[in-house]
Amino acid sequence: MAKKNKNVLVRLVSTAGTGVFWVKKRNPKTQTEKLSFRKYDKVVRKHVLFKEEKIK
């Protein structure tokens, strides 16, 4: 049997408040802190900070 994947899907939501999000995989054992990336928000057409939220 195959092993169960330990990675968790998380949602990176734009701090600009536009509702744009990216979905990333994160291993909770090795990456204990929350993710935050500076990525492109296509609604505001700028690079903004994206912070981690759980996928509902």
Swiss-Prot record:
Q: Which Pfam families match?
A: Ribosomal_L33
> What keywords does the record list, in alphabetical order?
Ribonucleoprotein, Ribosomal protein
Entry superkingdom: Bacteria
For whether the record's keyword set contains Ribosomal protein, the answer is yes
PROSITE patterns in UniProt: RIBOSOMAL_L33 (PS00582)
GO: which molecular function terms?
structural constituent of ribosome
**Cellular component, GO annotation:** cytoplasm; large ribosomal subunit
Entry annotated with the keyword Ribosomal protein:
yes
BP term (GO), one: translation
> Mind telling me which SUPFAM superfamilies this protein's record contains?
Zn-binding ribosomal proteins
Q: Which family does it belong to?
A: Belongs to the bacterial ribosomal protein bL33 family.
* PANTHER family linked: 54S RIBOSOMAL PROTEIN L39, MITOCHONDRIAL (PTHR15238), LARGE RIBOSOMAL SUBUNIT PROTEIN BL33M (PTHR15238:SF1)
Q: Kindly provide the name given to this protein in its UniProt entry.
A: Large ribosomal subunit protein bL33
Q: Which organism is it from?
A: Rickettsia canadensis (strain McKiel)
Gene (name only): rpmG
